[in-house]
Every structure is written in C-alpha cells, then in structure tokens.
C-alpha cells in the first residue's frame, strides 16, 4: 500500500530540505573561507586573496596556518588556554545550574505546600517580567563576595533554579507515580535515599538532555566571561574580540580579516556540532516528551 502525502507535507518537506541545504552551503563557505590566506597591507585596504576569491576554492589550503597565526595573535593567551577556560566555565556552570534546578523541582513536586507553590510562582514571574538594569548591581555584588574574576565564582552564581528547565523537571517529577516513593519508603528508605536512588535515576535521560542544551548555551556565551572573567578568556570571547580587533598583538591586527575570523568560528562551532550529532537523538527525544516520560 502506497503512502500518500498531503500537499502541506510535501511543501514542508521541500522547505526544510532547502533550509538544510542552505545551512550546509553556509558551513561549507565558512570552511573554504577559513582556508584562504591574507595578503597585502590591511591598514591601506589593498586587495588580498579573500576579496578576490569570495566563493571559489582556496588556491592554497591554509586553514591550519591560519589557526597557528591566531594562536600566537592574542596578547593575553593562547587557544589552548582559552579552550581550557571554556571547558571549565561551560561544564561547571552547566552542572551547577542543572543539578540545582533538578533538585529544587523534585522537592517542589514531591512536597506540595505554600512554599513550593511560591517557588513555582517566582519561576513563572521571572520568566514573564524582564529584569532590566540589574547587571551593574550584580557585578558589584560579585566583587563584594569575592566571586568576580573567578571561574568557581561563576559556578556559584549560576547555581539557581530560575528558567524554563525548572518547569520541565517539575513536569517530569509531577508525572511520576507516587507508588515508586511509597514502595521505597516501605522498604525502609529515607527521604534522601528516595531522591537519590529512586527519583533522580528515573530522570537521568532528561537530565542529560537539559545538561547538553545548557552546556551549548554556556559554550557559546561571551558576554558573561567578558563582564565577570576578564583574566579567563574563553573561545567565544576571543572570537568577539578578534572580530572587533581587540586584544590583538600590535603587528597582528590583520587577524580581524574574514578568513582568520572564520577559522576561529570553526574552532568554536565544530565541538558543539560534534556534540550535537552524537547526542541528537537523546536531545530531540527526551526533552520533547520530558513531561510525559518518567
């Protein structure tokens, strides 16, 4: 029996196919551009190889040479140290954020009282009402508490339960049959063991999905490191500064040329793309049905 597709389904398929092809073309252009070289005097805007060959194949494959120049082009660190700072910042902040959110959501879903309802209301209100103008006060508070310019300080500051992921965890725990908890209590488990040995293992795939999404958010974040971690440059911050011609050695301002910027873009995006490809099924499946599955 042949499957019939409606015109709407066919139209959506064509649109999504064109969108995927468009994104692949852009990624291919980034790779080709990052492999091209720079010739000429940037200060006088003389023609170089890139403007003369915008979309064609590179005459020489210079990607690794460009990366090597970028590695030596910053006045305050190498790419390896920036990558280390990025991993510490992204992994630490993601773990603190997701663990705190998961535990608070479990407690509010398990123990229903006025306080848990207040916490739920605070989360919803903070998502609806934008908080504007608090950045200066937050920076001053971080300095007063000795959290400023410390990666572990950022871990503590990101250890909060506010945001959409609280609602996801809350929905998951709320949908769990109470029989699990009652059976564990009959077997002699206390509240701590019920949480760690029963509830949390049941949401491990939802936890992993949310952790990966939050990790990608922090990996691509350059604003917070720029404001709070001036001595711990991340790759995303390096990309921003390079594109603006900041923190480059005096004789290497040409690194803000497009081929070199695209090479840094690859360094920032390729790890995330690999991570997403490896865990794509886990990401798309568990989070989308996180409120229905235990």
Task: Pin down the residues of each PLM region.
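A structural signal for multi-pass alpha-helical bundles of membrane permease subunits
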Residues: 2-294
